[in-house]
């Protein structure tokens, strides 16, 4: 995920947490709020009680990668925060990807892009 696609300032995190809506999953919590620009920005929060700095950074990298893989499917115009929960520590990669996708769908931020049919691809 590029730097311009990330939430960075504490003010932005506070705005999303206080003024947005929240959905939960055993691995992650998703908070969303309308963005000021027509793009998607993501932030990730991992509390200190979830492990050492090395572990917390690994969790952030995993969520960032799962989000990057579906970034084009997220409807623009939203700021998104993923909060890592304790169950994340033992989750497999597939479970993490599924949790990210499911939360985005619950929040109605999932934008299915039309896939061209076989006939369209081959003329």
Swiss-Prot record:
Subunit organization: Consists of a catalytic RNA component (M1 or rnpB) and a protein subunit.
Enzyme class: hydrolase
Recorded family membership: Belongs to the RnpA family.
Lineage: Bacteria, Bacillati, Chloroflexota, Chloroflexia, Herpetosiphonales
Enzyme Commission number(s): 3.1.26.5
Full protein name: Ribonuclease P protein component
Superkingdom assignment: Bacteria
Source species of the chain: Herpetosiphon aurantiacus (strain ATCC 23779 / DSM 785 / 114-95)
SUPFAM superfamilies attached to this UniProt entry: Ribosomal protein S5 domain 2-like (SSF54211)
Claim: NAD is one of the keywords in the record: no
UniProt keyword terms in alphabetical order: Endonuclease, Hydrolase, Nuclease, RNA-binding, tRNA processing
Biological process per Gene Ontology, one example term: tRNA 5'-leader removal
Function field: RNaseP catalyzes the removal of the 5'-leader sequence from pre-tRNA to produce the mature 5'-terminus. It can also cleave other RNA substrates such as 4.5S RNA. The protein component plays an auxiliary but essential role in vivo by binding to the 5'-leader sequence and broadening the substrate specificity of the ribozyme.
Pfam families: Ribonuclease_P
Catalysis performed (reactions): Endonucleolytic cleavage of RNA, removing 5'-extranucleotides from tRNA precursor
GO cellular component terms attached to this protein's record: ribonuclease P complex
Record carries keyword ATP-binding: no
HAMAP family in the cross-refs: RNase_P
GO molecular function, one term: 3'-tRNA processing endoribonuclease activity
